[in-house]
């Protein structure tokens, strides 16, 4: 639970259906409570409140129910590309056209096309030079850095970058 992890909480948003009454009483920040039966997920409600920030970090958004994990990934892929999903073992972010730097915080690094694109990787075990990656391909699964930092260049399209420390 985020409430036990010591993160500073500025606002709590959602239906709180998975939170015990005891834990709910521990929330000391402003609360925006929504009905359980609604058209949005709790994550979507929270992201909408923060949509103007450059980067939004969603902690714990990949734990628990797989349907909610997939929904959170899809929110990052298609609606709010400034969202980074992160937990103690992995991080998922969107890389659009441009040059991006990745450090060696994570051992396994994969790239999945959100739309067909062109990808270059340097400083990686499996480098690429302007490789066209089609939407159905998994060719760029499980790479790793050979240096302290790797350079990712997206010339076309956009990619989901999955970084993990799982074995």
Feature-to-residue mapping (PLM):
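Long, charged alpha-helical interface segments
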Residues: 95-167
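Residues that form or immediately flank small-molecule/cofactor binding pockets and catalytic motifs
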Residues: 36, 88-90, 116
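N-terminal start-of-chain detector that recognizes signal peptides
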Residues: 55-57, 82-85, 91, 122-126, ...
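Short beta-strand segments
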Residues: 59-61, 86, 112
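Class I SAM-dependent methyltransferase SAM-binding "motif I" and its flanking Rossmann-like core
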Residues: 72-73, 77-104
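A short acidic, often aromatic-flanked loop/helix-cap motif at beta-alpha or helix-coil junctions
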Residues: 37-41, 91-93, 134
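Acidic/Gly/His-enriched mid-domain segments of enzyme catalytic cores or analogous surface patches
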Residues: 1-81
């Amino acid at each position: 639970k985020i409430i036990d992890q010591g993160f500073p909480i500025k606002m709590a948003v959602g239906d709180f259906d998975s939170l015990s009454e005891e834990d709910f009483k521990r929330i000391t920040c402003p609360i925006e409570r929504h009905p359980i039966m609604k058209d949005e997920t709790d994550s979507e409600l929270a992201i909408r409140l923060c949509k103007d920030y450059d980067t939004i970090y969603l902690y714990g958004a990949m734990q628990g129910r797989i349907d909610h994990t997939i929904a959170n990934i899809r929110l990052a892929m298609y609606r709010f590309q400034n969202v980074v999903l992160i937990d103690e073992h992995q991080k998922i972010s969107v890389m659009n056209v441009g040059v991006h730097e990745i450090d060696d915080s994570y051992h396994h690094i994969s790239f999945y096309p959100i739309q067909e694109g062109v990808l270059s990787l340097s400083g990686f075990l499996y480098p690429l030079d302007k490789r066209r990656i089609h939407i159905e391909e998994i060719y760029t699964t499980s790479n790793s850095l050979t240096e302290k930092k790797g350079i990712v260049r997206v010339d076309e399209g956009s990619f989901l970058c999955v970084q993990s420390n799982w074995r």
